[in-house]
Amino acid sequence: MAFHMPLKELQPVDTSLPEHVVKGAVVIDKEFTIWNHRAVIPSNALHTVFITINLLEQKLTDVVKMAARSMNLSEDDSYGLMADKPKRFITDDNLNSLGSGFILTLCASPDHYVKRITEILTEGNNISQMENAVKTLDEFSLDPALIEAFYRCSSLELLFSLIRDDRVCMSSTLLSTCLRALSSMLELAVGDFTWKSVPNDVVVSMASLVTGKAKREEANTLLAALQMLEQLVIGDDTTRDWILEEVPIETLIRHVEKSDERIALCALSLMNSMIRRCPDDEKRFELIKSLEVVPFRNAVHSSLLRGGGGVRNLNAIEQLVEVQRSLISAYETSPPTDAEVQKILDIESSEDVSEEIREMWKSQIGEHRCGRLAAISMVQFAEKSPQDLRMLISENTMRIEGGKWQLIPMWMRCCDIAAELFRVIPGRDELDRLIVVLFSTETPFPAVFACIVHLFHRTWREMQAKGGEMEKVACVVLEQLRHVLKRREIQDVEELSADLETFSYRAMQEIWREEQLGKENIQLHSEAVIQLKSKLRPKMEELVRINHLNYLKLGAVFRKPQKSKSLAKLAFWHWKLDASEKMLTITGCDGENYVEGVQRDDIRQVWIKDIADVTNNDEIDRKASSSRFTSSPSTQMLRGIRVQLKTTNDMKEGEVLMALTSDETQSVIWLEGLAELIGSKAVKSETDAMVERMLKMELRVRLLNVKLTNPEEKPEIPPIPDDIKSFISKF
């Protein structure tokens, strides 16, 4: 009977755990008894158990007791739970981050870890044990649970005493690990323990590791000390002043030359932080001047700017650019002296310059934004390159009147260009691209200024500029400089000058043309322009259709196809669409030139409605260029138009009219024009191409009047109104 009972549908059962319930494994720490000497693991203890945690109801203490009970361990001892990746102690705060499938380690509590570390470091007998203890502290230095236990059961003074201890300094591993652990703990800023907590004598000990006063110098120790000193400079004004006193910036130069790029970068970063955070302007100026030395430039070149054309470290470039900004800020930009101004005026010996213009130049030089920097660059150019100056002036004098530049205004404008590249004046600087050049030259600003003067002279000549176009030429010169610097990394001033000589005004025009085409293509593919294009397309298609029909109404001469391949006389006929666009008139003619108005007997009129189909039918004419002087005739491709008339009573398949021409454009327009008249849906390549060309022309003309925002230009922020209450009340 049971076999014949009806089937009962089973309902699916959800066996998944609720979201607040997670299940995983717990294993016993192999080093459990090392960190807790009093703990005893019984023989019947289970080393791995599976537990289920209710995250809503259970706290950490409940989970620890449950795990210990499941493992047959004594619940009297204090335990901790540790996650492996990342390695950290589980607390009530991060317990909710556990998911199903977790694997935790039942270990000694954070307090036991700290007490054992403190015992080992306090005894100080076994360097190997001390290294392992500090290594463990370093591993957990970013774990708030263990750091809180460290501050509760021990103190930072323990680590400070290690840094002061000369015996510890002999072990580079112990010292570097201790510095890293201390740095991470202070960076974590648990409680009131921050970088302000470091005492003066510890700062002195760390400074000695950098300045060369320490007995030994090791890469990892040096790296950790440099990083900590920078944090002390940034973190607090008091520790900053201690660093500025204990660490002369000159002692950091030798670290920039290290083969280990990490040390060089940390040394540069510390230099920049010391200069940036220095509260006294006079002291900051002294720090900057200490870097204007040849050993520093050589150190940067040998370590961070080595040749080879490889990809530069972006962090290194950022640090070097900041160094250069500091060096540039120390440039002498105060107003030049009267003697310096007069020296510049004496260089311009042209008799055509009036006294009034000289006074104006004198005033402009004295008020120039670059001050003495501009005056020194001009004088240096005249003194170091007198032959170049004579050549420039002699070429300039040979130009027609009105097409010459004036030396001093040209020099001042070139100084403006160099100042913008160096960020002496507001603008878009190119320090990152000039960085190798800047560190390869003792006086980079005058050297780059000289290159700009030569480029300005060449561009003026190539543009055929006139007297009032100084600003126009200057804008082109600035763009030329930016493009040359963008193309590749330049190693020195000589290479910059050589690259500028090969970069003409015509090359700049080609770049502008390509950029303009690129911008137009981007604009043409924007969503707004695509929508406008779809709206304009019907109008353009109608214009092209009318244009093709008008072309047909003008008429054209075609060759008649020949039935035989003999050298018979070629026959031609003239096809023309009438004004009503309803009839095609075909007239025979004697040659390729049709004469309008001549009476002919062989005239035929074909109604457009009688045309069934229009197709192309090309053929090869092997007699087109044959003559009695050639042994073999050449070939010519003739484009054919095949007009299929509708069937009549006389002809079942309909008559076929053929017209041949060597003009491909004429053939395509007639073919597509007739197809349009009879309503054929054949592919219209010429029509579509012309529609696209006209659409692009129309869109580009319309976009000429659209002002596009430049992403590099910052919008002008209006000033706050004087009476802001009344302004707000209006809205």
Swiss-Prot record:
<dbReference type="GO" id="GO:0043652">
    <property type="term" value="P:engulfment of apoptotic cell"/>
</dbReference>
<dbReference type="GO" id="GO:0030334">
    <property type="term" value="P:regulation of cell migration"/>
</dbReference>
<dbReference type="GO" id="GO:0032045">
    <property type="term" value="C:guanyl-nucleotide exchange factor complex"/>
</dbReference>
<feature type="short sequence motif" description="SH3-binding">
    <location>
        <begin position="715"/>
        <end position="718"/>
    </location>
</feature>
<dbReference type="GO" id="GO:0048870">
    <property type="term" value="P:cell motility"/>
</dbReference>
<dbReference type="GO" id="GO:1902742">
    <property type="term" value="P:apoptotic process involved in development"/>
</dbReference>
<dbReference type="GO" id="GO:1901076">
    <property type="term" value="P:positive regulation of engulfment of apoptotic cell"/>
</dbReference>
<keyword id="KW-0053">Apoptosis</keyword>
<dbReference type="GO" id="GO:0019899">
    <property type="term" value="F:enzyme binding"/>
</dbReference>
<dbReference type="GO" id="GO:0006911">
    <property type="term" value="P:phagocytosis, engulfment"/>
</dbReference>
<dbReference type="GO" id="GO:0017124">
    <property type="term" value="F:SH3 domain binding"/>
</dbReference>
<dbReference type="GO" id="GO:0005886">
    <property type="term" value="C:plasma membrane"/>
</dbReference>
<feature type="domain" description="ELMO">
    <location>
        <begin position="339"/>
        <end position="485"/>
    </location>
</feature>
<keyword id="KW-0963">Cytoplasm</keyword>
<dbReference type="InterPro" id="IPR006816">
    <property type="entry name" value="ELMO_dom"/>
</dbReference>
<dbReference type="GO" id="GO:0030036">
    <property type="term" value="P:actin cytoskeleton organization"/>
</dbReference>
<dbReference type="InterPro" id="IPR024574">
    <property type="entry name" value="ELMO_ARM"/>
</dbReference>
<dbReference type="GO" id="GO:0070986">
    <property type="term" value="P:left/right axis specification"/>
</dbReference>
<protein>
    <recommendedName>
        <fullName>Cell death abnormality protein 12</fullName>
    </recommendedName>
</protein>
<dbReference type="GO" id="GO:0070273">
    <property type="term" value="F:phosphatidylinositol-4-phosphate binding"/>
</dbReference>
<dbReference type="GO" id="GO:0000132">
    <property type="term" value="P:establishment of mitotic spindle orientation"/>
</dbReference>
<keyword id="KW-0729">SH3-binding</keyword>
<dbReference type="GO" id="GO:0005737">
    <property type="term" value="C:cytoplasm"/>
</dbReference>
<comment type="subunit">
    <text>Interacts with psr-1. Forms a ternary complex with ced-2 and ced-5.</text>
</comment>
<dbReference type="GO" id="GO:0080025">
    <property type="term" value="F:phosphatidylinositol-3,5-bisphosphate binding"/>
</dbReference>
<dbReference type="InterPro" id="IPR011989">
    <property type="entry name" value="ARM-like"/>
</dbReference>
<dbReference type="Pfam" id="PF11841">
    <property type="entry name" value="ELMO_ARM"/>
</dbReference>
<dbReference type="GO" id="GO:0005547">
    <property type="term" value="F:phosphatidylinositol-3,4,5-trisphosphate binding"/>
</dbReference>
<dbReference type="GO" id="GO:0070064">
    <property type="term" value="F:proline-rich region binding"/>
</dbReference>
<dbReference type="GO" id="GO:0016477">
    <property type="term" value="P:cell migration"/>
</dbReference>
<keyword id="KW-0446">Lipid-binding</keyword>
<dbReference type="GO" id="GO:0044877">
    <property type="term" value="F:protein-containing complex binding"/>
</dbReference>
<dbReference type="InterPro" id="IPR001849">
    <property type="entry name" value="PH_domain"/>
</dbReference>
<dbReference type="Pfam" id="PF04727">
    <property type="entry name" value="ELMO_CED12"/>
</dbReference>
<feature type="domain" description="PH">
    <location>
        <begin position="544"/>
        <end position="679"/>
    </location>
</feature>
<dbReference type="GO" id="GO:0035262">
    <property type="term" value="P:gonad morphogenesis"/>
</dbReference>
<dbReference type="GO" id="GO:0007015">
    <property type="term" value="P:actin filament organization"/>
</dbReference>
<dbReference type="GO" id="GO:0060097">
    <property type="term" value="P:cytoskeletal rearrangement involved in phagocytosis, engulfment"/>
</dbReference>
<keyword id="KW-0581">Phagocytosis</keyword>
<dbReference type="GO" id="GO:1903356">
    <property type="term" value="P:positive regulation of distal tip cell migration"/>
</dbReference>
<dbReference type="InterPro" id="IPR016024">
    <property type="entry name" value="ARM-type_fold"/>
</dbReference>
<dbReference type="Pfam" id="PF16457">
    <property type="entry name" value="PH_12"/>
</dbReference>
